[in-house]
A protein has these predicted regions:
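Long, helix-rich, hydrophobic modules that act as membrane-proximal anchors or helical bundle/coiled-coil regulators
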Residues: 104-222
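Membrane-inserting effector segments that mediate pore formation, membrane fusion
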Residues: 5-67
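Short, surface-exposed, charged/polar-biased interaction segments
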Residues: 41, 45-48, 67-70, 86, ...
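Membrane-proximal, non-transmembrane interface segments of integral membrane proteins
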Residues: 58-131
Length: 222
């Protein structure tokens, strides 16, 4: 098993994980030098790397990983389910590498910590057996492709506060969300307007969440 994946596994179930919340917002240098958490497996590994060079990608991955772990351990997984999953990956290195390795690859792509929190919520749903591994893969790709600036608009659609594109100047956001396969656009109206002598045709649509989008958002908003 890859060393980073192994340390990630140890950190995910570490007895000292509960102290992370107090330090998650501090800088990376403060994290790796803090006596209270510097022996945390994933921090210890990154500390060795970062002492050699100030690699911005490694620093970001450490922050995203700790954000993920902090969210994962917010006490809404039963001890039974948690231990069941822990035993599975401890006794199956291939499963551990496939699943935790995939999570690390995704975290390495993220810049916004909000995405790491979303991913952690999805992973918790998987551990609780609310979604399958295939669904986790599908939903995690949605997070990966999501523009974080579009999430507030997606939330408005999910909550029913926005149900069409009338008078909106950010249709591009609708098109981006539609490309993720989680909203439905249905024809509402079409009109022709003239601006500075140039004619344009505007088509407005009703907006709803499809079942896939509802399930995704039910997890993310929990």
């Amino acid at each position: 098993m890859d060393q980073l994946t192994e340390d990630f596994e140890k950190s995910l179930f570490s007895d000292t994980k509960d102290v992370l919340g107090d330090y998650i917002e501090v800088g990376v240098d403060a994290l790796i030098n803090n006596d209270a958490i510097k022996e945390f497996p994933i921090i210890k590994t990154f500390a060795a790397v970062l002492k050699i060079g100030k690699n911005i990608h490694d620093r970001n991955l450490l922050k995203q990983t700790l954000t993920f772990i902090n969210e994962f351990n917010k006490n809404n997984i039963s001890v039974e389910r948690l231990n069941e999953y822990k035993n599975q990956i401890e006794n199956d290195s291939k499963k551990c590498e496939e699943e935790l390795g995939r999570v690390l690859l995704l975290l390495n792509n993220f810049i916004d910590k909000e995405k790491s929190i979303m991913l952690s919520k999805l992973f918790k749903a998987y551990v609780k057996q609310e979604i399958s591994w295939n669904e986790f893969g599908e939903y995690s790709e949605i997070i990966n492709r999501l523009f974080i600036q579009d999430f507030s608009f997606l939330k408005e659609i999910y909550l029913g506060r926005v149900n069409d594109t009338t008078d909106r100047n950010d249709i591009y956001r609708v098109e981006r969300l539609n490309s993720l396969g989680i909203i439905v656009m249905s024809f509402k109206s079409s009109r022709i307007s003239t601006i500075n002598g140039v004619m344009s045709n505007r088509q407005d649509s009703y907006l709803t969440m499809n079942n896939n989008g509802k399930k995704f958002m039910n997890i993310i908003m929990n």
